[in-house]
Amino acid sequence: MPDIKLPDGSIRSYEQAVTVAEVAASIGAGLARAALAGKIGGQLVDTSYLIEQNADLAIITERDAEGLELIRHSTAHLLAYAVKELFPEAQVTIGPVIENGFYYDFAYKRPFTPEDLVAIEKRMAELAKKDIPVSREVWARDDAVKFFLDLGEKYKAELIGAIPADQQVSLYREGDFIDLCRGPHVPTTAKLKVFKLMKVAGAYWRGDHRNEQLQRIYGTAWAKKEDLDAYLHMLEEAEKRDHRRLGKQYDLFHMQDEAPGLVFWHPKGWAIWQEIEGYMRAVYRNNGYQEVRCPQILDKSLWEKSGHWEHYKDNMFTTSSENRDYAVKPMNCPGHVQVFNAGLRSYRELPLRYGEFGSCHRNEPAGALHGLMRVRGFVQDDGHIFCTEDQIESEVTAFNALVKKVYADFGFNDVAVKLALRPDSRVGADDVWDRAEDALRQGLRASGLEWTELPGEGAFYGPKIEFHIRDAIGRSWQCGTMQVDFSMPGRLGAEYVGADDTRKVPVMLHRAILGSLERFIGILIENFAGALPLWLAPVQVVVLNISEKQADYAAEVAQKLHSAGFRAEADLRNEKITYKIREHSLNRLPYQLVVGDKEKADGLVAVRTRGGQDLGQMPVDVLIKRLQEEVVARSGTA
């Protein structure tokens, strides 16, 4: 006779074992209709799950975050069901949930077309409308392998074959379609009402370019139609803001086939870069960091000692010379340990903070490259703090405050914090990971921050705090990180002399605020739709003469602004002033200064803001003071 405790603290008693669906029905007909799954002891289960003992139970509906993930997961299966009905020869592989949706990979003899996607989506809607029950079945592993091989589903059979033979596997059936899955799933296809297929892209089996190429169909699914509409509107807005298009339009950078994943910065784009690097260099200096510079290429043996070779070699570029093997650095941390090791260190020097604008290279798959957002060569505002274990909390707390300040200066005030915990592939003993994870939690508590935890998402050498900024159209971008590492310093021989005159191994904190500068610039371009705030704008002020008679004065004003430290240009073309104003307005320049005969005679400029506001005439010195105040405040221009 199980007693079921509900989230409101009430307890319901039942005379016999009861399913999650039956509990929901006993509470109310509305909840029974809305139930998608249950949550028992923190674990999600199907509504058909039989509760035989006392338990704490929450009924999951579309209002819960877990409910939306269930909808997306189940819609991925619905997609596979529809594809198999329309294209029986297609083989199914995997179909996980991703941010804002899902995808499913298929092996098929020809590319899926846009017309195919329309047909597949239509069939999905038909299957959903049929209200087909979704049920869980438990099979012996070998029986499941044989079943899928008999169906000609070699990929699914391979996945199941990798499971230990003595383990059972769970399969989910809906109508004539059956798929491998841990679950849970929605109880019926009728729960899947709001979805849209987005695109087809290439993928490789198991993510390895040496394997067969597959076709990946992406989709999105939501609980309500208005949520889908809002998401599609956001995508339209994101397309308008695409940094690749704006980068070309505003002459900031380009990329080309001869250097995949590498950036050619144009003068205007490099001006943005230099401004950001200068700002972050001041952040280093003002917060006790010593800037260092380490080699691009290091002997393979060092990467073996650090653990990178074992856990990261597939993402590393390598080269050989004079019978020695080298790797181009994908990360800066081993180099910073070498700087630490170059002298005898004392506990009195700790915490010792190193910062570097470290140029790194990672061999990302060609299909994953995406403008500035995913590159093969990038620079990080990277830093490493060598400290004692009892200094971790204060260092993490100080860093958390610094991150908040930096993001605010760039216009990002909505920051979510996540704690990524130990992955399956890692270095170090579990007790070391326990200490590292607890140290980060303590630092977050001391900062008064709320966070969510991400099991299995940490780096191979340590857990990490992730800082996710939200942009102007609601997208979340993970930028900053703080990681505690008890392993790498010892692996690379880092030591200091403690207060008791014994040699001790320091703790190493890996930290970055912006992350990849390339990616952060891409985020900035899209966040501001190219209209960067004054302090970041590649051209801050343009001076426009009305006629040839004011050309010398316009050039003089531009030079005065330039001498005051501003990125200023003079547009002296023999064009109508309305044409020049319109052109520079389209280029989203923060300020336009118009000079005619009156302005020249009185030593003034007529000032227009990016938003079209007319600030009237003013002396150049007054304008310079205004601009200086705006730059110091890091505020945007209307």
Curated annotation (Swiss-Prot):
Keyword rRNA-binding: no
Names of the cofactor(s): Zn(2+)
Region (Catalytic): 242-533
Pfam families per the UniProt record, alphabetical: HGTP_anticodon, TGS, tRNA-synt_2b, tRNA_SAD
Location of the TGS domain: 1-61
InterPro entries per the UniProt record, alphabetical: aa-tRNA-synt_IIb (IPR002314), aa-tRNA-synth_II (IPR006195), aa-tRNA-synth_II/BPL/LPL (IPR045864), Anticodon-bd (IPR004154), Anticodon-bd_dom_sf (IPR036621), Beta-grasp_dom_sf (IPR012675), TGS (IPR004095), TGS-like (IPR012676)
Cofactor: binding details: Binds 1 zinc ion per subunit.
Residues binding Zn(2+): 333, 384, 510
Compartment(s) where it occurs, according to its Swiss-Prot or TrEMBL record: Cytoplasm
SUPFAM superfamilies: Class II aaRS ABD-related, Class II aaRS and biotin synthetases, TGS-like, ThrRS/AlaRS common domain
Keywords, ordered alphabetically: Aminoacyl-tRNA synthetase, ATP-binding, Cytoplasm, Ligase, Metal-binding, Nucleotide-binding, Protein biosynthesis, RNA-binding, tRNA-binding, Zinc
Catalyzed reactions per annotation: tRNA(Thr) + L-threonine + ATP = L-threonyl-tRNA(Thr) + AMP + diphosphate + H(+)
GO cellular component, one term: cytosol
GO molecular function: ATP binding; metal ion binding; threonine-tRNA ligase activity; tRNA binding
A Gene Ontology BP annotation from the UniProt entry: threonyl-tRNA aminoacylation
SMART domains (alphabetical): tRNA_SAD (SM00863)
Spans through the membrane: none
Keyword Cytoplasm (UniProt): yes
Family designation: Belongs to the class-II aminoacyl-tRNA synthetase family.
Function: Catalyzes the attachment of threonine to tRNA(Thr) in a two-step reaction: L-threonine is first activated by ATP to form Thr-AMP and then transferred to the acceptor end of tRNA(Thr). Also edits incorrectly charged L-seryl-tRNA(Thr).
Quaternary data: Homodimer.
Name of this chain's protein: Threonine--tRNA ligase
Source organism of this protein record: Dechloromonas aromatica (strain RCB)
